[in-house]
Curated annotation (Swiss-Prot):
Residues 142-209, 288-356 form the GRAM domain. May act as a GTPase-activating protein for Rab family protein(s). The modification Phosphothreonine is found at T397. PROSITE patterns: EF_HAND_2, TBC_RABGAP. This is TBC1 domain family member 9B. Residues 422-447 have a biased composition (Low complexity). It comes from Mus musculus. One of its GO terms (cellular component) is membrane. It comes from the Eukaryota. One of its GO terms (molecular function) is GTPase activator activity. It is found in: Membrane. Keywords: GTPase activation, Membrane, Phosphoprotein, Repeat, Transmembrane, Transmembrane helix. The chain crosses the membrane at residues 669-689. The gene is Tbc1d9b.
Length: 1263
C-alpha cells in the first residue's frame, strides 16, 4: 500500500536491500522469508514486542537521492507480489520524469506530491463513507486479520499489550479484542503463541489479584482457563471485555447481533488510537447507565454531561453534581447518592436563559417549566455551548400544545389536593364511561373499545368512605397530607426533586390514592405514556379477534390472577386484564406472554387505568426486570444466582444448609417473578412493590435476605426441602400490613397452609426497616456487575441444556455415540454462529428464533452445509465434493426452506458413516435421483423428475421415507397408513368386527412402528435410475476413489461393475419393449416406467450397424488414462456375466446368460462408455462429455453437446447392489469404518484458527 512519505533516518539497520535504482530502494525485513536464522528470531521478537508495522508489512520502498542521507518511505507491502507491483509502477511512471530534474530537493518534492496524490485518489475511491478509524488502528486491524485469518467482516474494537500466562511462564504479546473474538499473539525467540476464543464460549470473566497473578483478568471457557496480566489500564480493558461478552450472551439469548450505530456523531478532534467501534461501545455503555439511573425510555441517547451545582430551594443549598443532556431530557444527579436527583423533560420546559454571573453564582443557567418551577444551575464550564445544545433539542421537541395538554396539569404544584389530580389517561383519547360494556365478552365492536378509566380498586371500594375506617383511615389521611406537603416543597410530577426524604416517605407507605401516580413517575412509565398518546388504544384495536399461542395462554391464566380479590371475580376486571396482556403480547411478540405477568398486571390494574397498567408493564418487562418474562426466564435465573451469592456472603452458615437442601432455587424464582405478590398477603406485598418502583431490584434482594435472616434458626433445624419450604411459606403468609385501609383479602396460600398454632405476625414495615438496616449496602452498579457474572453462567448453562435436549431428541438408531453427537452439535452451532458474524445476506439462517424448539433454533444453509460436508464426509470427492454436498443438502431439506436443522444434518452424516453396505449405497443412490439431482447438473434430470413424479406417484412415498432421510417418522407412518387405508375397502367392516370403540393412540403407535420397520427393510420401492443419472453416479464413484490408496484396484472394479450394469440396462430395455406390445387392459405391471413405455414408439433394435455408432468426444478421449482403457477393455472381453432382473423391476425375472459373442456385439458402444466413465479424470467429466450405452444413438434423447442419451435405458437399485457385491474391493471400501471424531477435531482446529483464504504470505519467522 502507498504511504504518506515519512523520513527514515537509518535505512539498513534491520532491512536488506533487494532492488535499487538512482531514486528508489526496495527492501525486505531482515529474517523474513527462508533461512532467517538467529537474526530472524531476534528481529521477529522485536517486531512483536514493539508492535512494529514490519510484522504485517515486511517489504517497503524508500525514496532517496544521491547526495542526501535522508530516506523517505513511500510504500510497504505484505507480500512480494504487492511490493513488486508498486516498484514496477514507480519505474514505469516516474523514473524518466525524475531524470529531467536538476535539483534534488525538487525531485523529493515531486515524488512526495505524486505519492500524496495517489493516496488521495485511492481514499476517494476505496474508503467507505464514514470510515474514521485512525491510520495506526487500521494497521493493527490488518495485523490481526493476517495473523488470525479473520475475514473482512470481523471488526477490531481495540488492542492492548499484555502478558498471557502459559503455565507459570508469562508470554508478552498483543491482545486483540474484536466484536466476536478474543485473540492473543506472542512471538518470543522462536516460541509462538496464537490464541483465538469466541466470546460466545466464555463461561467466566473476572478481574482478580493473587500472589501468582498480580492484577490479572481471568477468562474461562468450557475446556480451558486463561490468565492475562500486565495491562497498562486493566480497568478499561476489563470493562470492554465485559461489554463484548455481554453482547455475545445477548446474541445467544435472543439472536441480536451487533449493529454499529451509524447515527453516532463524529468527534470534533479524533482520538489517535480509538476506533469508531470503541467509541460506539463506550457510548452504548454510557447510554445504558444514563437510562437506568433516571428510568428513561430505551431509545433515549445521552448527548453529553458536565459538572455543575444545583440550587435546591427546600434546603437553600448549592448541591454539586453532574448535569446530563439528551435529546428529550435534562437530568441532574448529585455526587452524594441520596442528596438530590432531578429529571426535567424538555416537553415541560418553557424558558432557558443565562442568569447574571456573580461570585456566589458563576455561569448560572435558569430553566423554567410549565408547572411554574424554576431550576437554577451554576458553575457550568461551557455555558454558551450548553444553551445552544438545549435550544437545538427544544426545537426538535414535539409541539408545545401537545406537551401542555399532556404534562402541564400533573406537574403543577398549585393544587396539592389528590382528589383534583387529573389521571394520566387524559393524555390519550377520552376514557369510556363506567357504563360501557366492560362486562361483555371480548367480541365487542372495534368502533367503541371499552377501557377502564380508573383503577379497579376505586371502582370496588368507592362506597367505603375513609371516615368509617377509624384509626386506619386517620393514618391514611396523615400519609396523604405528608405527601401533599412534600409535593409543595419538592414539586409534583416528573420534575419533582427526588431526595432522601422521598425515599423515607415511600418506605412509610404510599397512600392508595397516590399509588398509581407515583408508580408511573418512579418507574418512568409516565414518560413513555405521554410521548405515545393513543398507542395503547391502537394496540387493543389491532389485537381484537386475533388469536395466537400467547392469547390462548392468557385465556387459560385469566381466572388464576388474584382470584381472591373481588375485582377479578367478575368480567369487569378480567376483561381489562385480558386487554392489557393481549396488547402487550402484540407489542412485544418475542416475549408474548409469560407466566407471572398476569399476577403482576392484575395488581397494576387495581391502582391505575388500563393504559397506565400497560405502560407500567412495559417498564417492568423491558427496563426494570430485563429478560425476566420470556420463555426461559433468564433474568429471574440471573437474579436468583445473585441472591445465592449474597446469601453466601452475608449468611454463610445458612447458605451451606440451603444448598444442601436445594431450597434457594425453589423459593426465589417465584419471589422475583411476582415481586412477592404470589407468596405474601396482597396488602403487604404491594408495599414492597412501592419500594421496588422507587429503588429497583435492590429492594427485592434486600427483603429476600431479610426473610432468610429472620428464619435462620428454624431453617438450620430443617431436615429436607419440604420442611424448609413450609417454614418460609408460613412466615410469608403472616407478614401483615396493619395500616392498610383495604378490606383484608385472605391469601390463598395461607388458607392452604394454616396450622393449629399460627406463627407470630410480622409487620411489613418492620420487615422493610430491617432489610434496609442490615442489607442496604447493596449498590446498583454492584448488582449490575453481579448480573453480568451470573448471566454468563446462566446462559451457558441453558446452552448446555439445549445441547443435551437436542442430542436426546436424536433417535438411538442413528449410529453416533452421545459424545460424537455433542461434538457434532457444537460444530453445527459454530457454523450457524459464523453466519451471524459474517453471513452477509443469509437472513434466514442468521436470525434464530429462541421461541422455537431447541432442535429448530440452529439451522444452516446450503453454503454452510457445503463447508461442513467437505470437512466431515468420509466420501471425499476432491473437486466434486461441493456438487455432492449440494445434492445431499437438497435431499435433507424436506420443507424446501433452504435450511436444515441438526437432526436432518446428523441423519445425512449417519447415512454415510453407519449402517451396512446396503444402507450406504442407498444413500449414495438417492443422491443421484431427484430431488437431489437438479437439471443444472444433468440435462435429462428434469425429464427424469417428471418421469418419476408424474408417471409413478405411488413411488413418491418410498423415495421420501427409506433411510429416514426425509419426513419425520410419525408423518411417514401416517402417510403410509392413509395410502393403505385408501386401498383397503374392508377396513371399516374390520373395525366394526373388532368393536365400536375407536382404537386408542397406542394402536396407532404400534402400527407406525411396524410400518417404519417394514419400510426400512425394503429396497424394492426405490425408483429406477435412467442413463444420465447413472453416468452422474459413475462420476461420483470415480472421484470418490481418486484419493484412496487402492485407487487403481477400485478403478478397475468400478469399470467392471459399470460395464455389467450398462449391459443389464440394455437387456432390461428389450424386456421393456416386449411389455409395450401387451394389450392396454392387461395385468398392471409393478414397473413404474410402464405407463410411459406404453405411450412411446417401439424401442429400436438392440443390435445396430457399427457405422451408426456415436463417435466419442475427442477431448475426453485424449485425456483418458491408457492403463485404465487396457484394464477395462480386457475386463469387457473376458467376462461371462450373469444378469438378474432383466426387466429392471427386481421381481425375480429369469436369469440370462450372455456369451462372449453377444457381449462383444452388444457392447460395441458400451465399452467406450465404461472406459470414459471409469478412467477419465474428474475435471474431464464435464457436462459436455457424453457417456452412452449400446443403444445410445436412439433419437429419443439428445444431450447438450449434440450426442445422444437413451431415455429408455434404466436400472434398479437391486441391480447396482448385486453388481457391486461381485467386487470385494468395492465392498471393502464401503464397509470400511471411519472415525468421525478425528474429522470433528480437525474441523474444530480449523474454526479455532479461522484459516480462511488470505492473500498474505505466511510469516517467515515462525520457526
Amino acid at each position: 500500500m502507498w504511504l504518506g512519505p515519512e523520513e527514515v533516518l537509518v535505512a539498513n539497520a534491520l532491512w536488506v536491500t533487494e532492488r535499487a535504482n538512482p531514486f528508489f530502494v526496495l527492501q525486505r525485513r531482515r529474517g523474513h522469508g527462508k533461512g532467517g536464522g538467529l537474526t530472524g528470531l531476534l528481529v521477529g521478537t522485536l517486531d512483536v514486542v514493539l508492535d512494529s508495522s514490519a510484522r504485517v508489512a515486511p517489504y517497503r520502498i524508500l525514496h532517496q537521492t544521491q547526495d542526501s542521507q535522508v530516506y523517505w518511505i513511500v510504500a510497504c507491502g505484505s507480500s512480494r507480489k504487492e511490493i513488486t507491483k508498486h516498484w514496477e509502477w514507480l519505474e514505469n511512471n516516474l523514473l524518466q520524469t525524475l531524470s529531467i530534474f536538476d535539483n534534488e530537493e525538487d525531485i523529493t518534492t515531486f515524488v512526495k506530491g505524486k505519492i500524496h496524490g495517489i493516496i488521495a485518489e485511492e481514499n476517494k475511491n476505496l474508503q467507505p463513507q464514514g470510515d474514521e478509524d485512525p491510520g495506526k488502528f487500521k494497521e493493527a486491524e490488518l495485523k490481526m486479520r493476517k495473523q488470525f485469518g479473520m475475514p473482512e467482516g470481523e471488526k477490531l474494537v481495540n488492542y492492548y499489550s499484555c502478558n498471557f500466562w502459559k503455565g507459570r511462564v508469562p508470554r508478552q504479546g498483543w491482545l486483540y479484542l474484536t466484536v466476536n473474538h478474543l485473540c492473543f499473539y506472542s512471538f518470543l525467540l522462536g516460541k509462538e503463541v496464537s490464541l483465538v476464543v469466541q466470546w460466545v464460549d466464555v463461561t467466566r470473566l473476572e478481574k482478580n489479584a493473587t500472589l501468582l497473578f498480580p492484577e490479572s483478568i481471568r477468562v474461562d471457557t468450557r475446556d480451558q482457563e486463561l490468565f492475562f496480566s500486565m495491562f497498562l489500564n486493566i480497568g478499561e480493558t476489563f470493562k470492554l471485555m465485559e461489554q463484548l461478552a455481554n453482547l455475545a450472551m445477548r446474541q445467544l439469548l435472543d439472536s441480536e447481533g451487533f449493529l454499529e450505530d451509524k447515527a453516532l456523531p463524529r468527534p470534533i478532534r479524533p482520538h489517535k488510537n480509538i476506533s469508531a467501534l470503541k467509541r460506539d461501545l463506550d457510548a452504548r455503555a454510557k447510554n445504558e447507565c444514563y437510562r437506568a439511573t433516571f428510568r428513561l425510555p430505551k431509545d433515549e441517547r445521552l448527548d453529553g454531561h458536565t459538572g455543575c451545582t444545583l440550587w435546591t430551594p427546600f434546603n437553600k443549598l448549592h448541591i454539586p453534581g453532574q448535569m446530563f443532556i439528551s435529546n428529550n431530557y435534562i437530568c441532574f444527579a448529585s455526587k452524594e447518592e441520596d442528596a438530590c436527583r432531578l429529571i426535567i423533560p424538555l416537553r415541560e420546559v418553557t424558558i432557558v436563559e443565562k442568569a447574571d454571573s456573580s461570585s456566589v453564582l458563576p455561569s448560572p443557567l435558569s430553566i423554567s417549566t410549565k408547572s411554574k418551577m424554576t431550576f437554577l444551575f451554576a458553575n457550568l464550564k461551557d455555558r454558551d455551548f450548553l444553551v445552544q445544545r438545549i435550544s437545538d433539542f427544544l426545537q426538535k421537541t414535539p409541539s408545545k400544545q401537545t406537551g401542555s395538554s399532556i404534562g402541564g396539569t400533573k406537574a403543577s404544584v398549585s393544587d396539592p389536593a389528590p382528589e383534583s389530580l387529573p389521571t394520566p389517561q387524559e393524555a390519550s383519547e377520552p376514557p369510556a364511561s363506567p357504563s360501557s360494556p366492560l362486562s361483555s365478552p371480548p367480541s365487542f365492536s372495534t368502533q367503541e373499545i371499552p377501557t377502564t378509566s380508573q383503577g379497579l380498586l376505586k371502582v370496588f371500594q368507592k362506597n367505603s368512605p375513609m371516615e368509617d375506617l377509624g384509626a386506619k383511615g386517620a393514618k391514611e389521611k396523615m400519609k396523604e397530607e405528608s405527601w401533599n406537603i412534600h409535593f409543595f416543597e419538592y414539586g409534583r410530577g416528573m420534575c419533582m426533586y427526588r431526595t432522601a426524604k422521598t425515599r423515607e416517605l415511600v418506605l412509610k407507605g404510599i397512600p392508595e390514592s397516590l399509588r398509581g401516580e407515583l408508580w408511573l413517575l418512579f418507574s418512568g412509565a409516565w414518560n413513555e405514556m405521554v410521548t405515545h398518546p393513543g398507542y395503547y388504544a391502537e394496540l387493543v384495536e389491532k389485537s381484537l379477534g386475533k388469536y395466537s399461542l400467547a392469547t390462548e395462554e392468557i385465556e387459560r391464566d385469566l381466572h388464576r390472577s388474584m382470584p381472591e380479590h373481588p375485582a377479578f371475580q367478575n368480567e369487569l376486571g378480567i376483561a381489562a386484564l385480558r386487554r392489557v396482556l393481549t396488547a402487550y403480547a402484540f407489542r412485544n411478540p418475542t416475549i408474548g406472554y409469560c407466566q407471572a405477568m398476569n399476577i403482576v398486571t392484575s395488581v397494576l390494574l387495581l391502582y391505575g387505568s388500563e393504559e397506565e397498567a400497560f405502560w407500567l408493564l412495559v417498564a417492568l418487562c423491558e427496563r426494570m426486570l430485563p429478560d425476566y418474562y420470556n420463555t426461559r426466564v433468564v433474568g429471574a435465573l440471573v437474579d436468583q444466582g445473585i441472591f445465592e451469592e449474597l446469601t453466601r456472603d452475608v449468611l454463610p452458615r445458612l447458605s451451606e444448609k440451603m444448598q444442601e437442601l436445594g431450597v434457594i432455587s425453589s423459593i426465589s424464582l417465584s419471589w422475583f417473578l411476582t415481586l412477592f405478590l404470589s407468596v405474601m398477603p396482597f396488602e403487604s406485598a404491594v408495599v414492597i412493590v412501592d419500594c421496588f418502583f422507587y429503588e429497583g431490584i435492590k429492594v427485592i434482594l434486600q427483603v429476600a435476605l431479610a426473610v432468610l435472616d429472620a428464619n435462620v434458626e428454624q431453617l438450620l433445624d430443617c431436615n429436607d426441602e419440604g420442611e424448609a419450604m413450609t417454614v418460609l411459606g408460613r412466615y410469608l403468609d403472616n407478614v401483615v400490613n396493619k395500616q392498610s385501609i383495604s378490606p383484608p383479602i385472605p391469601h390463598l396460600h395461607a388458607l392452604l397452609t394454616s396450622g393449629d398454632d399460627p406463627p407470630v405476625e410480622v409487620d411489613i414495615f418492620d420487615l422493610l426497616r430491617v432489610s434496609y438496616e442490615k442489607f442496604s449496602n447493596l449498590r446498583a452498579d454492584d448488582i449490575e456487575q453481579m448480573r453480568f457474572k451470573q448471566r454468563l453462567k446462566v446462559i451457558q448453562s441453558l446452552e448446555d441444556t439445549a445441547k443435551r435436549s437436542v442430542v436426546r431428541a436424536i433417535p438411538g438408531d442413528i449410529g453416533f455415540s452421545i459424545e460424537e453427537l455433542e461434538d457434532l452439535y457444537m460444530v453445527f452451532k459454530a457454523k450457524h454462529l459464523a453466519s451471524q458474524y459474517w453471513g452477509g445476506n443469509r437472513s434466514a439462517a442468521v436470525h434464530r428464533d429462541p421461541s422455537l424448539p431447541y432442535l429448530e433454533q440452529y439451522r444452516i444453509d446450503a453454503s454452510q452445509f457445503r463447508e461442513l460436508f467437505a470437512s466431515l464426509t468420509p466420501w471425499a470427492c476432491g473437486s466434486h465434493t461441493p456438487v455432492l454436498a449440494g445434492r445431499m443438502f437438497r435431499l435433507l431439506d424436506q420443507n424446501k426452506d433452504s435450511l436444515i436443522n441438526f437432526k436432518e444434518f446428523v441423519t445425512g452424516m449417519s447415512g454415510m458413516y453407519h449402517g451396512d453396505l446396503t444402507e450406504k449405497l442407498k444413500a449414495l443412490y438417492k443422491l443421484h435421483l431427484p430431488p437431489a439431482l437438479i437439471p443444472e447438473e444433468a440435462e435429462s434430470a428434469l425429464e427424469a423428475a417428471h418421469y418419476f413424479t408424474e408417471d409413478s406417484s405411488s413411488e413418491a412415498s418410498p423415495l421420501a421415507s427409506d433411510l429416514d432421510l426425509f419426513l419425520p417418522w410419525e408423518a411417514q407412518a401416517l402417510l403410509q397408513e392413509q395410502q393403505e387405508g385408501s386401498g383397503n375397502e374392508d377396513t371399516p367392516e374390520r373395525r366394526e368386527e373388532k368393536g365400536t370403540s375407536p382404537p386408542d393412540y397406542r394402536h396407532y403407535l404400534r402400527m407406525w412402528a411396524k410400518e417404519k420397520e417394514a419400510q426400512k427393510e425394503t429396497i424394492k420401492d426405490l425408483p429406477k435410475m435412467n442413463q444420465e443419472q447413472f453416468i452422474e453416479l459413475c462420476k461420483t464413484l470415480y472421484n470418490m476413489f481418486s484419493e484412496d490408496p487402492m485407487e487403481q484396484d477400485l478403478y478397475h472394479a468400478i469399470a467392471t461393475v459399470a460395464s455389467l450394469l450398462l449391459r443389464i440396462g440394455e437387456v432390461g430395455k428389450k424386456f421393456s419393449a416386449l411389455t409395450t406390445k401387451k394389450p392396454r387392459d392387461g395385468a398392471h405391471s409393478g414397473d413404474p416406467n410402464s405407463a410411459t413405455e406404453e405411450d412411446e414408439p417401439p424401442t429400436p433394435k438392440l443390435h445396430q450397424d457399427p457405422t451408426q455408432e456415436c463417435q466419442p468426444p475427442a477431448a475426453g478421449d485424449r485425456q483418458a488414462k491408457a492403463s485404465g482403457d487396457m484394464h477395462l477393455g480386457k475386463a469387457l472381453q473376458d467376462s461371462h456375466v450373469i444378469v438378474e432382473g432383466g426387466s429392471g423391476e427386481g421381481q425375480g425375472s429369469p436369469s440370462l446368460l450372455l456369451s462372449d459373442d453377444e457381449t462383444k456385439d452388444d457392447m460395441s458402444m458400451s465399452s467406450y462408455s465404461v472406459v470414459s466413465t471409469g478412467s477419465l479424470q474428474c475435471e474431464d467429466l464435464t457436462e459436455d462429455t457424453v457417456l452412452v450405452g449400446g443403444g445410445a444413438c436412439s433419437p429419443t434423447a439428445t444431450s447438450r453437446a449434440g450426442g445422444t442419451v437413451d431415455t429408455d435405458w434404466c436400472i434398479s437399485f437391486e441391480q447396482i447392489l448385486a453388481s457391486i457385491l461381485t467386487e470385494s474391493v468395492l465392498v471393502n471400501f464401503f464397509e470400511k469404518r471411519v472415525d468421525i471424531g478425528l474429522k470433528i477435531k480437525d474441523q474444530k482446529k480449523v474454526e479455532r484458527q479461522f484459516s480462511t483464504s488470505s492473500d498474505h504470505e505466511p510469516p517467515g519467522v515462525l520457526g
